[in-house]
Amino acid sequence: MVSKVAAEGYVDLGLPSGLLWATCNLGARQPTDAGLYFSWANVDGHVPGDGYNFGNTTIGLPYSGTNGYNAKNYLSADNSFSPDSGYDAARYNLGGSWRMPTNTEILELYDNTTWQYTSVNGVNGILHTSTINGNTIFFPITGYIENTSLIVGQLVYLWSSTLHYKGNINTQNQAYIYLYGNNTVNRGEHSLVYYGFPIRPVYDPSL
């Protein structure tokens, strides 16, 4: 289990949903830290160099080479797994009202903030500023892990809890992500589920 200190605070951006975004990535102790890296639907996090190979990872959702992820048994109507499904890394590790954001909630963040590339304590990243109340939240550039290699460029990657659905929910192997690159946030981006990305938890007062 990840220590609760990993996400002990949140930022109120005044979002219409009432959702509150954690100040730190899951497993991080301050906003500029990367925290842990996760494959999608897997609750066990890893750090670069610990020997874990994401290419050989066993994703939480049952998988077969023929049928892919049998996701329909685990996902809600919007193709996101519920906080209590056992596959939400934020809810599993932090408990309480913490969970992973859905793709819709990432889009809500985009739609109600401005963003700029900046540096905080020597760490490059993206600062979002609420257009509603002026509060800010920082996402550090952390890269991602492919197999065992940490690849760091100028992009921010973060998992959502939402499967990328393209007609047959049982054969999908990608999930939606938060992605900043080329001086803008990228709507509707998705990635193969076995890459290692950080997670930024959200605090859901309704839970």
Predicted segments, located by residue:
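C-terminal, surface-exposed recognition/capping segments
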Residues: E8-G9, G14-L207
